[in-house]
């Protein structure tokens, strides 16, 4: 097999895996976070808590920030019913003076497949 076929098979298997997961429910404490004003060049972090309120394990398939200036960290890629996990969005304010509204899309095995997590921060010169 060549690399193209192997990669295609891998992506198909992953797609089948995600489609076969049982759905669960999630509650997100704050989908929009207002951060304190900071000086340009500082790095800031916004935190979001996702509670698994359903009957099946919650899997985070991906987190997709809308800007390369925003990274992310997930405390756990899976959480069981009754438990929670955290997603942290990390923003580098270098060269971003002014009011910044940033977001990331999160995909999980829930009836609402996509969630938008956002934050706003005023970056001072």
Could you say what each language-model-derived stretch is?
Residues 3-53, 120-125:
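Beta-sheet-dominated interaction scaffolds and their linkers
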Residues 33, 83-89:
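Short strand-edge motifs at loop-to-beta-strand transitions and within beta-strands
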Residues 34-36, 74-79, 92:
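Beta-strand-rich interaction surfaces with strong enrichment in secreted/lumenal proteins
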Residues 40, 81, 96-97:
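Surface-exposed loops/turns
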Residues 105-112:
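Short, exposed beta-strand-loop hairpins at the edges of beta-sheets
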